[in-house]
Amino acid sequence: MKYLVAGLGNVGQKYENSRHNIGFMILDALAKASSVVFTDKCYGAIASLKLKNKCLFLLKPSTYMNLSGNAIRYWLQKENIYSENLLILVDDLSLPFGSLRLKTKGSDGGHNGLKNIQYTLRTKYYNRLRFGIGNNFPSGCQINYVLDNFTKEEKKHLSERIEKAIEIVYSFCLSGSEITMNLFNK
């Protein structure tokens, strides 16, 4: 069985360590732990790995956040992957820093990457792992906040939370969304 795990983020060194790029960070850590390397392909950087009898395609779209749906649709079609085997890794302002929540459907929550995915796939029924980045910013400064790097205090806990996100990805692919939500959404 095939899975597409897509991390949302923006390409370029300028954004590499920003809160908005947590999806890319999780995929980079997952690729490193699995000893696989990303290759630049159509619509993004892609890596693949075997997890027991599953084939995981890891995608970092090169379309920038607001057009992520194009890359995701392309790779779903190219690899003939069912949408229920799609998992989006995304930052979430409404969750405290480091909180992790798996959802099988829902609104875009104001996230432009999710908006584009829902528009492009024509559905809100797809899996997403929401990584809390908090909302510790003054009114009107949301864009600066998500594009800023994590604070020193947040960085102390970042690798541990990324490791937990990887556990959730593995569980999703091996056990499915319901079991994974029951195990990790606490």
UniProtKB/Swiss-Prot annotation:
It is found in: Cytoplasm. The record marks 10 as: Discriminates between blocked and unblocked aminoacyl-tRNA. GO terms for biological process: protein quality control for misfolded or incompletely synthesized proteins; rescue of stalled ribosome. CDD domains: PTH. Its EC number is 3.1.1.29. The active site is at 20 (proton acceptor). One of its GO terms (molecular function) is peptidyl-tRNA hydrolase activity. The keyword RNA-binding applies. The record marks 91 as: Stabilizes the basic form of H active site to accept a proton. It catalyses: an N-acyl-L-alpha-aminoacyl-tRNA + H2O = an N-acyl-L-amino acid + a tRNA + H(+). GO terms for cellular component: cytoplasm. Keywords: Cytoplasm, Hydrolase, RNA-binding, tRNA-binding. Pfam families: Pept_tRNA_hydro. The keyword RNA-binding applies. TRNA binds at residues 15, 64, 66, 112. Its main location: cytoplasm. Transmembrane segments: none annotated. Belongs to the PTH family. Hydrolyzes ribosome-free peptidyl-tRNAs (with 1 or more amino acids incorporated), which drop off the ribosome during protein synthesis, or as a result of ribosome stalling. Catalyzes the release of premature peptidyl moieties from peptidyl-tRNA molecules trapped in stalled 50S ribosomal subunits, and thus maintains levels of free tRNAs and 50S ribosomes. Monomer. NCBIfam families: pth. This is Peptidyl-tRNA hydrolase.
